Amino acid sequence: MTVGSGHRWPEPSMHPTEIAYAKINLALHVRRRRADGYHDIETIFAFAEHGDIVAAEPGPARLMLAGPFAPALAGEDPEDNLVMRAADGLCALAGEAARPAIRLDKRLPVAAGIGGGSADAAAVLRLLGRAYGIAADDPRVMTLAATLGADVPACVRSATVRGGERGDRLESIAADGLHGLPLLLVNPRVALPTGPVFAAWDRVDRGPLAPGDPLAAALAGRNDLEAPATLLHPVIGEVVTLLAAQPGAILARMSGSGATCFALFGSEADRDAADRALAHRRPDWWRLTSRLR
């Protein structure tokens, strides 16, 4: 099928797909509230090897939802979804008059502190950019990404980077020591929008993120949103405590504004043992075993 200015989409069995890699904030320091209502932050973004899956299919333009967490989005206006806004913007950059249909396989919890809509939108930018011959690091794509959300530029890159200002000023860093580290994500099945967590933050600037090696900086750092999120949902503290107590855990912390928490491990055996232990103790919690990209 030909779409827009002559782009031919693959047949149904060959629909291109892209992973919307789960985002992890290894550390997140909130420095101050800005005049525009956002907050200046310092963070280390990292990404799991797994996430939601987006696919582009022949039109008409529409958003099709699938996956275990699709029901959480079912009541939303598709045109308000970041995925469709990303598709609109990328097609405009490419000079395409028509959008393809987008299928979103929602495998990660919603409002969970691991990228969610930002990662999905970023995956669409990469996917359609590849189809239309526009590189993901094209300045126009990164500018578009920043208009969609503060985390979207980092999610477009989906590599370990430092983030400053709103989180959209990115600095490339050497992260060889993080690549491939076994990772366990746990969510107590609590949806936690960002706004209430920032509103509960005590507005105390506890200092900058340390420079240098990202793992060392993360270990010396903190997530300033973990305390207010835990005030809102004390179960988050239980998740972090259980993760930190697992043998072989290197770092356990809440990601983003929650409620998903993570632990990094020195070996896949330790990670898998922790996964089994948490499954036995709290079978109702959502879990994902992965590795850092």
UniProtKB/Swiss-Prot annotation:
ATP binds at P109, V110, A111, A112, G113, I114, G115, G116, G117, S118, A119. One of its GO terms (biological process) is isopentenyl diphosphate biosynthetic process, methylerythritol 4-phosphate pathway. The active site is at K23, D151. Keywords: ATP-binding, Isoprene biosynthesis, Kinase, Nucleotide-binding, Transferase. It comes from the Bacteria. Its EC number is 2.7.1.148. Pfam families: GHMP_kinases_C, GHMP_kinases_N. Transmembrane segments: none annotated. The keyword Acyltransferase does not apply. GO terms for molecular function: 4-(cytidine 5'-diphospho)-2-C-methyl-D-erythritol kinase activity; ATP binding. Coiled coil: none annotated. It is an enzyme of class 2 (transferase). InterPro entries: GHMP_kinase_C_dom, GHMP_kinase_C_sf, GHMP_kinase_N_dom, IspE, Ribosomal_Su5_D2-typ_SF, Ribsml_uS5_D2-typ_fold_subgr. SUPFAM superfamilies: GHMP Kinase, C-terminal domain, Ribosomal protein S5 domain 2-like. It catalyses: 4-CDP-2-C-methyl-D-erythritol + ATP = 4-CDP-2-C-methyl-D-erythritol 2-phosphate + ADP + H(+). Pathway: Isoprenoid biosynthesis; isopentenyl diphosphate biosynthesis via DXP pathway; isopentenyl diphosphate from 1-deoxy-D-xylulose 5-phosphate: step 3/6. Catalyzes the phosphorylation of the position 2 hydroxy group of 4-diphosphocytidyl-2C-methyl-D-erythritol. Belongs to the GHMP kinase family. IspE subfamily. This is 4-diphosphocytidyl-2-C-methyl-D-erythritol kinase. The lineage of its organism: Bacteria, Pseudomonadati, Pseudomonadota, Alphaproteobacteria, Sphingomonadales.
